[in-house]
Amino acid sequence: LDVYSRKVVGWAMDTNMRTELILEALEMAITQRRPRNVIHHSDRGCQYTSYAFGKRCREAGIMPSMGSVGDAYDNAMAESFFATLEREVLNRRRFKSQAEARMAIFEWIEGWYNPHRRHSGLGYRSPVNYERSHWRSRARMAELLPPAAPDSLSGKISKAA
């Protein structure tokens, strides 16, 4: 879950909570975001304290961060997301199979939550729309900045004053 936009960027499902499952979700997030110097916050589950998870984070330039034991408020955004998933998807119907449940969750995340579900903390915009407006304003800001010019002494490019 991207803290800035509330967008689900990496997720995986299975009948267990093995480290491999967590690594699968992490790989999805890395592929989507190509992060550098970001923080991955989680609880202190054994999957997140595993050597394999820590190693993959280091390889990707991600700094692991973990909350204190037994404190749901330490990762309130993730807790809120899962409560919303339960309320809006899982508690509304009985699934005939795990495959049906997986498809419902996939459709909810990729077809509803990320592109359309509005969040008060995002000015009542969806995660996708919030990110779009962020990138648009960055592009506008770049247009307003003066062009980069070579520094006459070092040959390096610096921002013109």
Give a label for each model feature.
Residues 1-161:
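Charged DNA-binding/catalytic regions of mobile-element recombinases
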